[in-house]
Amino acid sequence: MAREFSLANTRNIGIMAHVDAGKTTTTERVLYYTGKIHKIGETHEGASQMDWMEQEQERGITITSAATTAEWKGNRVNIIDTPGHVDFTIEVQRSLRVLDGAVTVLDAQSGVEPQTETVWRQATEYGVPRIVFANKMDKIGADFYYSLSTLGDRLGANAHPIQIPIGAEDDFIGIIDLVTMKSEIYTNDLGTDIKETVVGSDEFNAELASLDFNAEEYTELANEWREKLIEAIADFDEDIMEKYFAGEEIPEAELKAAIRKATINVDFYPMLAGSAFKNKGVQMMLDAVIDYLPSPLDIPAIQGVNPDTDEEDERPASDEEPFAALAFKIMTDPFVGRLSFFRVYSGTLDAGSYVLNTSKGKRERIGRILQMHANTRKEIQTVYAGDIAAAVGLKNTTTGDSLTDEKAKIILESIEVPEPVIQLMVEPKTKADQDKMGVALQKLAEEDPTFRVETNPETGETVISGMGELHLDVLVDRMKREFKVEANVGAPQVAYRETFRAGTSARGFFKRQSGGKGQYGDVWIEFTPNEEGAGFEFENAIVGGVVPREFVPAVEKGLVETMANGVLAGYPMVDIKAKLYDGSYHDVDSSETAFKVAASLAMKEAAKTAKPAILEPMMKVTITVPEENLGDIMGHVTARRGQVNSMEAHGKSQIVNAFVPLAEMFGYATTLRSSTQGRGTFMMVFDHYSDVPKSVQEEIIAKNGRNAD
């Protein structure tokens, strides 16, 4: 079957924002207007189509990224609705990796919020073009121009309105399109009765006058903002610049094309206005998705590496190219089992065919191919370049794996996974629960790369790690509901890390003789601190075979295993370089095991002089409080070993930005609530790891039963 929509008429977009900005409601309206659903479900009533998990409907938030496909004016729009809560940041990250464009939804009252900054930064890292939708224009305190200023002030984004609202709050009645200079005026809240008029026309003047608005004022405002838009876009388009300086009229099509080009090049962010809940501005936002966000043909060919030659390669978006796709999400479906979501970059794929998982070097059979709408599905026979779909039957594929034609191998850039910052102990209630818990945790970890499951080597307890309390709360809840596992859950603990702060060299010597074959391993290793976030790096600098080549991997393995259980308090060690530069071996007694043990001894010896340190996660905390509570809040931050970075006024509130250790933030919601009579709010997002103070380090070591030496 031939493809239904051309690549030029395909859009792969994400809808992303801070929690509660109205992303899911916006997506619901998109589905309603594109004919995908025939009844609107409200998020706050737990009836949203895209928030299909029980936990999502109970909490009124998005937890997983739901995928759906819609059609708009002859175009296919593949949409991924992503979570806004910081604990589910991997869902945003893996979605952005496979999308071509995004709609950033702002709450028009608050503008850019902490998680907006996080998702914006992630989108910038992946070079994703964006349009901005100032939602909730009907809300008390909604301010389109304040929201615009926060894009520049907090994100440094070159954002400019391509629309301006007519009115705000209860008086939000319409939108002016600055490109076409036409207005849409809404006479009901269903988005069904829309009057379109030309700005400045008699009809426009009469319509606004009938609603008690000053038409002249809005005509003037529209002309002023259109002038600013042309001036901004002229920086990226010489033809428009020439016409602008010559005082010539700029045709609508030319202006649209220039905005599209600057947006796709990630130089410019068009800003729109609306209220998804009141059905205002959603159709215009859909038009902007088609007009300004890229098709798969507009973005550079996907880059990768040929695993056989290690040479760089690429796959242009075309059905004629060899098949290449990236698996970006694994999900367990109660009806069809394990689902692997993937984005096709090039070529086509039929159900029942074979592909090569080049990341794992394993052949996989594609059972069925499904087009997803949240958690419902439609079976399809073929997928084409630019499509997003889910496959049944992939046994070895995990998040970030490349799937390709067996005869044209390529490994695409994978998905970076952030380190977990919080952990807790889980204990099955019965023997039956113990057996089921292992399976449940394994399946949940397959779905979510930021969720880690480990066994404490000393106590045998199962420890689960994740991105925050809500993240682990939801996963434990899923374990109980979906897998029927009853478990006792410990209190949340901080996921500390350990590292070396000084360079040193150390010898690891292991020799054992007990009748028959002995054990002999001898290594000299130089340890140096690595850059933050760079992880562990191993270098083999052996010359002359003093440590035979076949034992070098065992040395690296011995170091990695030792680093999993750090030297100070048993926390994983990070950001260390190790250079194996000398050693000796025995012709008969040397073995992989002996060299593994020797490497482990070298690291423990190095710890005596390498100034080992414990690192703790530092959170970027944003606290919003009434002015009269500002003094209390500054006291809270200081008492929690925090550091205030900035303060800004917003209406009658003060916004405090600070870095605070995660360990000090447990229970802060209760403290803030009582200090502000429930009027204060806070958001936190992981920012970086930092050394704990010496006194705190000693407490941690004492608690974990280790000695500082």
Swiss-Prot record:
Major site of localization recorded for this protein: cytoplasm
Going by the UniProt record, its keywords in alphabetical order are:
Cytoplasm, Elongation factor, GTP-binding, Nucleotide-binding, Protein biosynthesis
Which one GO biological process term can you cite for this protein? ribosome disassembly
Q: In the UniProt record, does the keyword rRNA processing occur?
A: no
One of its Pfam families is EFG_IV
List each copy of the tr-type G domain by range: 8-297
Q: Please tell me one Gene Ontology term that the record gives under cellular component.
A: cytoplasm
UniProt-annotated binding residues for GTP? 17-24, 81-85, 135-138
What Gene Ontology molecular function terms does this protein carry?
A: GTP binding; GTPase activity; translation elongation factor activity
CDD domains according to UniProt: EF-G (cd01886), EFG_III (cd16262), EFG_mtEFG1_IV (cd01434), EFG_mtEFG_C (cd03713), EFG_mtEFG_II (cd04088)
Matching PROSITE patterns: G_TR_1, G_TR_2
Location comes to: Cytoplasm
SMART domains per UniProt: EFG_C, EFG_IV
Q: What does this protein do?
A: Catalyzes the GTP-dependent ribosomal translocation step during translation elongation. During this step, the ribosome changes from the pre-translocational (PRE) to the post-translocational (POST) state as the newly formed A-site-bound peptidyl-tRNA and P-site-bound deacylated tRNA move to the P and E sites, respectively. Catalyzes the coordinated movement of the two tRNA molecules, the mRNA and conformational changes in the ribosome.
Task: Please report which protein family the annotation says this sequence is part of.
Answer: Belongs to the TRAFAC class translation factor GTPase superfamily. Classic translation factor GTPase family. EF-G/EF-2 subfamily.
Q: Which PANTHER family match?
A: RIBOSOME-RELEASING FACTOR 2, MITOCHONDRIAL, TRANSLATION ELONGATION FACTOR G-RELATED
Name the chain's protein: Elongation factor G
User: What's the source species for this entry?
Assistant: Lactococcus lactis subsp. cremoris (strain MG1363)
